[in-house]
């Protein structure tokens, strides 16, 4: 059976990617990262619940806390306030330097070891105005580097099925494919209830609103 490493944060995008990979007939190897982010425990809980829901047996939760040691972002540095400035073109302080590059590199090592043919990652161009490691060009070049830097018989494709979708499209497709949106977690700041104010919450809420669907998770603030 063909295999895919799915990088899964516990959020709605990566969850839909895993659902889509499963529909494509892949055996899923779920990969989650703990990097001392503010909502690390809540994201890990979402990851485990989603894997249970999807019947994913092979799952790996890796400690990459060196990312917090590098610092420079509000997700790991509690001295920085999480950006609530809006969804503009500037790189926000929630950008974790080269995070997707680090994650993809580790996923490539796992894929090579497991003999997997694909890496699924839920990057979305709509998010990429401020996140350079979400852009299609970045993914293409990472894919080329992986296939140069692995054994000759290793052929891995990075699959980004959501890259050209809007958040509303992602909500609609999640409902169409039976992705468990109610188990996913997007908030950057809180673990009890989603804050409703951070940029990630606002992107999520805007997606549900434009899709004409109510989000079932609880929010502390709804404007």
From Swiss-Prot:
Q: Does the keyword Acetylation apply?
A: no
Task: Relate the protein's function as given in its record.
Answer: Catalyzes the ATP-dependent conversion of 7-carboxy-7-deazaguanine (CDG) to 7-cyano-7-deazaguanine (preQ(0)).
Q: Where does Zn(2+) bind?
A: 187, 195, 198, 201
List the InterPro entries hit by this protein, alphabetically: QueC (IPR018317), Rossmann-like_a/b/a_fold (IPR014729)
Q: What name goes with this protein?
A: 7-cyano-7-deazaguanine synthase
So what EC number does this one have? 6.3.4.20
- Gene3D superfamilies in the record: HUPs
Annotated ATP binding lies at: 8-18
Q: Which family does it belong to?
A: Belongs to the QueC family.
Pathway annotation: Purine metabolism; 7-cyano-7-deazaguanine biosynthesis
* Source organism superkingdom: Bacteria
Q: Does the keyword ATP-binding apply?
A: yes
**How, per the record, is the cofactor bound?**
Binds 1 zinc ion per subunit.
Q: Name one GO biological process term.
A: queuosine biosynthetic process
Q: Which GO terms describe its molecular function?
A: ATP binding; ligase activity, forming carbon-nitrogen bonds; zinc ion binding
Q: Supply the alphabetized keyword list.
A: ATP-binding, Ligase, Metal-binding, Nucleotide-binding, Queuosine biosynthesis, Zinc
Q: Which reaction equations make up its catalytic activity? A: 7-carboxy-7-deazaguanine + NH4(+) + ATP = 7-cyano-7-deazaguanine + ADP + phosphate + H2O + H(+)
UniProt source species: Campylobacter curvus (strain 525.92)
The cofactors it requires, by name, are:
Zn(2+)
């Amino acid at each position: 059976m063909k295999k895919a490493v799915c990088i899964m944060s516990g959020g709605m995008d990566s969850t839909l990617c895993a659902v889509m990979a499963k529909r494509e007939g892949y055996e899923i190897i779920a990969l989650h990262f703990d990097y001392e982010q503010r909502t690390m425990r809540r994201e890990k809980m979402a990851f485990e619940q989603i894997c249970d829901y999807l019947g994913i047996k092979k799952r790996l939760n890796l400690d990459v806390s060196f990312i917090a040691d590098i610092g420079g972002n509000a997700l790991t540095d509690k001295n920085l306030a999480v950006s609530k400035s809006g969804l503009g073109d500037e790189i926000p302080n929630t950008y974790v330097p080269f995070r997707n590059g680090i994650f993809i590199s580790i996923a490539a090592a796992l894929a090579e070891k497991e003999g997997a043919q694909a890496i699924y990652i839920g990057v979305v161009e709509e998010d990429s105005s401020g996140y350079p490691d979400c852009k299609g060009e970045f993914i293409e070049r990472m894919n080329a580097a992986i296939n140069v830097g692995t054994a000759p018989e290793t052929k891995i494709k990075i699959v980004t099925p959501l890259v050209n979708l809007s958040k509303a499209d992602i909500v609609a497709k999640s409902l169409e494919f039976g992705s468990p949106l109610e188990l996913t977690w997007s908030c950057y700041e809180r673990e009890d209830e989603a804050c409703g104010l951070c940029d990630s919450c606002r992107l999520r809420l805007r997606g549900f609103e434009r899709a004409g669907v109510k989000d079932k998770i609880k929010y502390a603030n709804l404007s």
